[in-house]
């Protein structure tokens, strides 16, 4: 009788341990799933920013074509005249729980490219992630030739921070 009780106790302890391990494993899988969902939301947000930048560049190219000096108009549009409006349009992309920022509100010129960095933040179910991506817009292209927008606007250095 005592051996039966001891055997039953050992089996019960092993079962309780297994239940604890299964529960922990399920929690880890759930956290991993939620983390992956947040990651893809952020990547989707960066793609929305990219499409918004393409749209702005396309509109600016059309406006630049009717100006006397298209290249100067194009540069000034992003760097001086509509810089704040451009930043505002990027940061106001509405996606649930997604925050988009132009890093330091800085849009600058470097090596014939207009450059800026974007940070996307998301916090869902106590999981917080951020992604950063850099963008550059070429300024030395032929305005009269139909250049592919994907060659003018380049997204690079996308990484989790």
PLM region spans:
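Aliphatic-rich helix starts adjacent to a transmembrane/signal segment
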Residues: 2-41
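Conserved functional hotspots that engage anionic ligands or polymers and/or phospholipid headgroups
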Residues: 47-161
């Amino acid at each position: 009788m005592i051996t039966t009780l001891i055997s039953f106790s050992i089996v019960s302890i092993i079962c309780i341990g297994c239940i604890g391990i299964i529960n922990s494993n399920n929690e880890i899988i759930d956290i991993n799933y939620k983390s992956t969902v947040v990651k893809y939301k952020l990547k989707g947000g960066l793609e929305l920013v990219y499409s918004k930048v393409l749209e702005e560049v396309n509109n600016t190219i059309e406006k630049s074509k009717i100006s006397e000096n298209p290249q100067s108009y194009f540069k000034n549009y992003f760097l001086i005249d509509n810089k704040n409006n451009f930043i505002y349009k990027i940061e106001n992309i509405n996606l649930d729980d997604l925050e988009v920022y132009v890093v330091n509100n800085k849009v600058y010129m470097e090596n014939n490219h207009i450059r800026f960095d974007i940070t996307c933040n998301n916090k869902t179910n106590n999981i917080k992630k951020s992604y950063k991506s850099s963008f550059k817009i070429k300024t030395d292209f032929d305005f009269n030739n139909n250049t592919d927008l994907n060659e003018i606007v380049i997204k690079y250095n996308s990484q989790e921070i």
